C-alpha cells in the first residue's frame, strides 16, 4: 500500500516558491507572447494567432496598474463595467492570463528537463520534438501490434473549478499565485461552458486557450498518476515487437541482447519477449487504453477506472463514457487520421536438415489512412469544392494577385501532404491535390473573366507547377539518396517532428 501511495502522490521535491513576483516582470510577457506565436496557425491565413496589440508600452502600463492594489478590487454592483485594470479589462486580463500561464509552466519545464537529462548519460534530448503530433504514431506502431482490445475513453471535466486550483498546490506553494489563479477562474470564466459543454475540445475560451489547457492538462496528469504504477508493475524491460523476430536482420541483435540479460539476471529474461500489459494514449480530450486479454478483463478495467477516478480525483464519471472495442475490428478517428489495426500476412520458410516447410503468420499492423470523405467535407465547407468533391472557384480570393492565389492554394496542398505523410495509402492525397489544383485554376479564371482552358493556354501550365513539385521537393530534401527510387518513398510512411497542431482541414471533427 505504501508503494502504491508513493506513485499516486506527485513529486513534492519539485515544488517551487516565489512565482508570483515574476508577473511584475516585463520579459515574462515578451516570452509568453513569443512562445504563443503560431500556436493556432491556420493553413488558410498568414498569422491568425498573432496578436498585434502587444507592445512594451501596454506592458509597462499594465505593471504600473497592478502595483496599485485598488485595481484588483472587484465591483459587485456593476458586472459589465468592472473596475479591474480600468477600461481595457479584456486586453489586460488576456495579457495577465498568458503571462501567468507561462509562469506556472516553469516548474513543469524544469521537471521535464531534469527527467530527460537522466537518460543516455545525462544527455538532454530535444524536448520540442516530443511536442510533435507525429511523434505519437511511431510509438503506437511498435506497441499496438501486441494488443487485442481497446477502451475508448471520453475524459470528463472537473465538477468544480476549485479542483483545478487544488491540483497545482502540489507544484506551486506560492499562496499569492494560487489566489490569483482563483481570481481568473471566478472572474473571467463561464463555469457552465466548462462543465456542460458537449464538445470538450472546444469548450475553452479562445482568448485564454493556453491558460485553461494548461490547467486541464495538469488536472488530467494527476488522474493518470495510477498508470505509472501499473505500467512499472506490468513489465520490467521495454518490449520489442515479435514481428521483428521474423526479420533476419534483427536476429543477431536479439541474440546480443539475450546474452546481456543472461549475464545480469536470469529472471529478467522472462520479461524480454513478454508483450506489454497495457498501452495508454491521450489525445484531444479523449484517451485509449489497449491491453491484452479477454473482453472480461477489459470490462474489469472499465469499472476499476471509473471507481478510481470517482474516489481519488473527485470526478463525476459513469461507465457510458467508456466503450470496449476489439482492436482488429475497430477503426477510429485519431488526430486527423483514420487509424485501425489490420492483419498483415507474412510467409517464412524454415529448413531443418533436409526438410523445408513454409509457415504462414498473420501479424497485426497499425494502419493509418487519410479520411477522404471528412476531408472533402472540410474542403466543401471552406468553399473549395462541392460536397461531392467537384472543384469550384474561391470567389473571396479573386481580388488577390495571381501569385498570392497560387501561394495560398500551394500552401494548403503542401501542409496537407506534410501532415498526411504518414498515411499508408497516399492515393487519396492526389485526389485532394487535384481538387485544390483545379479550384486554383477556376479561381484564377474567374478573376480574369475567362474559362479554365483559355486561361491555361494563355498563361501556360507551368503557372501551377508548384502543385506538381511540392511533395517531391520535401522528399528530395528528406531522402537525398532516394531520388532514383522515389516511388518507394511515396509508399512508405514518413513522420515529422515539427507538427505542433492539427490543421483546420485535418481537424474535421
UniProtKB/Swiss-Prot annotation:
Pfam families: Intron_maturas2 (PF01348), MatK_N (PF01824). HAMAP family: MatK. Keywords: Chloroplast, mRNA processing, Plastid, RNA-binding, tRNA processing. This is Maturase K. PANTHER family: MATURASE K. It comes from the Eukaryota. One of its GO terms (molecular function) is RNA binding. Usually encoded in the trnK tRNA gene intron. Probably assists in splicing its own and other chloroplast group II introns. InterPro entries: Domain_X (IPR024937), Maturase_MatK (IPR002866), Maturase_MatK_N (IPR024942). GO terms for cellular component: chloroplast. GO terms for biological process: mRNA processing; RNA splicing; tRNA processing. It comes from Nicotiana tabacum (Common tobacco). The keyword Isomerase does not apply. Belongs to the intron maturase 2 family. MatK subfamily.
